[in-house]
Amino acid sequence: MKRWTNLGFVDTIYEDEDYVDHHSSSLSSSSSSLSLSPKQPINLSSSPSMELESRVHKWSLANNSKPDVFVNVGGTRFHLHKDPLSKSGYLKRHLTGVNELTLSPPLNITAETFSLVAGFCYGAHIELTPSNVVSLRIAVEVLLITEADDGGRVRDSLRNLTESYLRRVVFVNVDYIQIVLRSCLLLLPESETTAFLIGRCVEALMEIGDGDCVNEFLEEAVKLPAGDFNVVADAVQQRFPRHDLLYRIVDAYVKEHDGEMTEEEKVQICNSIDCDKLSPPLLLHAVQNPKMPLRFIVRAMLQEQLNTRHSIMVAAVAASCAAPTGVRHREIATEARDSSVTLGSLLQRDTAARQNCRLRAAMNSTSSRIESLEKELDTMKRFLSKESEKQKSDRNIVESRSRSVMDSARSASFHCVHQPSNVNKTQRGDRGSVSNLSTTYRRRRASPPQAQPQKSIGKRLIMGIKNAFSTSSKQVPKKNAYAVEEIYDGLEDFVWIKDDNDDNISEELHSHYIKNK
């Protein structure tokens, strides 16, 4: 017994035997001892450091070796041996060829935690508490602590010790779970990315805790930055088959930081929620939640439509399969006699009835939305048809106007000007005359030598046109001249519009006019 006393194990064995009773009495004494009081870090920082110094001194005497490396952690300098620290894969790799190492961020390890880990590497016993188990577990994962041996015997690794403590002590006590969960939130993101503790703590809290415990966790979670909250949301998503709790957490966080978050940040947070894993009441709440991003609301609406369609199909199949046959009725009656009605079946039946009512309400709201959309679609169709008819009528009006303009242009190609005798005419050579383009002839009506039947102007015009376009190259000027004379016989004044090919006709008409005059 003297040898154990000299080695310094008497107090450690006594504390280990009375470990559970000690913590139980501390919990029953006051509720304040469950929180992270400032006294606990003082005890943790002083006691392990003194024990570590003792362990280093004893190891130096036993192996006749002085400390050969320095490790700087959080402003504290540790003078240690390289051989015991080789139990850490991280320290062994980074201390190769050097005698000094600094553990700085992103390694989230404090000096108190490192003193406990280093003492474990020297073979010391570590007293696990709800306040230090999270930091030790993170240090184990970051520093890659494997196992330690004491006197040739292989001891359990520090990872197994912390895991056993979490399962046997922490996850069966609500107060311990809350302490560990607060420590995890303070040590994000390492507490989840390396140790996966947040999801496990929330799962244990939901199993043995009540609504007040969950509300306290929500109050702590909404205070986190967006990046750390994404880690918490992903952890809860992976641990729970249903996402009702995750939706409550995300909804509380979005409401708390509504004016501080962008739409993209809201979408990123809401992407952790699977709408297919939401209960019907929360799915309906998500559809009607104005704080959620529009993309998430659309996803919830589509999922609600799918659930409604699935419920309708299941009801239709059940109705079609329930054929009123005598054999089926006898089987149902036999099953009813054989099976006794239990409280669980009644509760299940009541739950199914409530779900049917909620589904019916959701289906009615969906039908009303579909009807409103159909009305809007019909209104848009009528508006588009009116616009197309209006455009068609405008096009027809434009085409008719263009045709009338073209017809008037064609009718003006051959123009006859009837001038009264009392109007002054522009003389040949005057300004504005068209003597170079037209020739004006004036004649008086001559009394016919013999009575001939008078022809109408229209008939004479037609005959003149026929004679003017008759096929005889030698007689063309003469015929054209007489044709024009015949056309305009009875008119005192007329104007002949001359083309380039009408020089011969103009001369013939002029000579004929002089002879008759």
Swiss-Prot record:
InterPro entries documented for this protein: BTB/POZ_dom (IPR000210), NPH3/RPT2-like (IPR043454), NPH3_dom (IPR027356), SKP1/BTB/POZ_sf (IPR011333)
Domain of life: Eukaryota
Keyword annotations of the record: Ubl conjugation pathway
Keyword Cell cycle: no
Polar residues bias: start-end ranges: 38-49
Region (Disordered): 28-49, 409-456
Domain NPH3: 224-307
UniProt feature coiled coil, ranges: none
Compositional bias of kind Low complexity: 28-37
Pathway connected to this protein: Protein modification; protein ubiquitination
GO biological process: protein ubiquitination
BTB domain ranges (all copies): 67-130
Cysteine pairs bridged by disulfides in the record: none
Domain characteristics, as noted in the entry: The BTB/POZ domain mediates the interaction with some component of ubiquitin ligase complexes.
PANTHER family for this protein: OS12G0117600 PROTEIN (PTHR32370)
Family: Belongs to the NPH3 family.
General function of this protein: May act as a substrate-specific adapter of an E3 ubiquitin-protein ligase complex (CUL3-RBX1-BTB) which mediates the ubiquitination and subsequent proteasomal degradation of target proteins.
Record's protein name: BTB/POZ domain-containing protein At3g49900
